[in-house]
């Protein structure tokens, strides 16, 4: 078959168009590309009082929600163009690596192990692991007072669980569930004796039931909350870091805390220093 000059030009044009389309698709699949398209999918928790809760009307409220909306705004995406997706603790890295979310703002502690799979901007908050018990319990005063007769509940895939396994497993019965609200339900019905996770999370649950629940003891870990995103996306990580610093500097960070966690009994900490690794 004789290939004409016109046919060759047609093949060349099609190849160029296909390459351009591929490049555009690749760019639009990035966080920056999604932001330029005016929309983002952000992973959060759905059941953490004061931090991130989905209301009966489908709206979302809480400190992590406010941080997520502020960061999205600095990336050019308004609140109404954000899709919030539930991000259970044990699934967060997978959701980021699979592209199910653009980034995650979900009391997500920065650890070296997690940084092998995903990147983190921040921290935007620093918390500490604590214990939540029933108001009537006077025997548990801290992690050191737990023993093999006591049942402790926390969430699969959390740093709280790992800390217990690494440092206290020999004398604690540990129940691992999917969410902290499930653990709190077990605490309230007497199935477990305590719930452990970060103090800011527990303060939210205690604030909803101050006659039934209380925090006890000193914190026994340091948890730096970061915004998790796909590994290697340095440009987006730096943009999010800039947004967090701006949120702290313009007072929005403090206001968000006071309007969400503050009323539930949380006490704010000194604003964290961003780790630009």
Q: Would you name each region that the model predicts?
A:
Residues 46, 126-133, 199, 203, ...:
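Periplasmic-binding protein-like
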Residues 47-49, 60-74, 130-182, 194, ...:
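Bilobed "Venus flytrap"/periplasmic-binding protein-like clamshell domains
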Residues 29-104:
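Extracytoplasmic small-molecule ligand-binding "clamshell" domains
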Residues 91, 107-117, 163-166, 188-222:
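A ligand-binding cleft/hinge motif common to bilobed small-molecule-binding domains
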